Amino acid sequence: MAKFKDTDLELTRANDEMRDVEVELNFTPNALASVLYKQGDTVILACCTRARNLPRWFPRDATKGWVNAEYSLLPGSTDSRFQRERRGAKGRTYEIERLVARSLRAGIDLEELGPHSLTVDCDILNADGGTRCASITAAMIALRLGVRRLIDQGL
């Protein structure tokens, strides 16, 4: 079992021991789809929303859709207050947003999506390591639920 101390954080989980995972669907009522995802002590709220228009850079006569992602650590999600990022994502946050968005687009047929633009927001409520992987998983669940709702609505 791995046991080491890094400041005041002590990890006693074995290297091959899985973290507990909990998924609560439809956590927020206003999003197209939402997921409260817990992986160990990491907690993420992923919400899928539909934009009225495709991105400005998309061709006007586009028949395929687009999926984007946003990622944000809430100020109280880490052991010391995380400063909110203003005027767009920077550095680490931007890299994670791109990773999540590309992962989502790799798992969906944008042609089948039709001319819809979906954004999945991943808000980290508590960060305890593994936020990238947990965000991708939570975002994919929210995207899947959102697409299912669009299909059910006949869109």
Annotated model-derived regions:
Residues T7-D20, L110-S117, D152-L155:
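Flexible, glycine/charged-enriched surface loops at secondary-structure junctions
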Residues E95, L99-S103, T119, A138, ...:
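Generic beta-strand or strand-like secondary-structure segments
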Residues E85-A89, C122-T131:
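A short glycine/serine-rich beta->alpha loop
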Residues L25, D41, L73, C122-I124, ...:
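Short, structured patches in soluble enzyme cores that scaffold and shape functional sites
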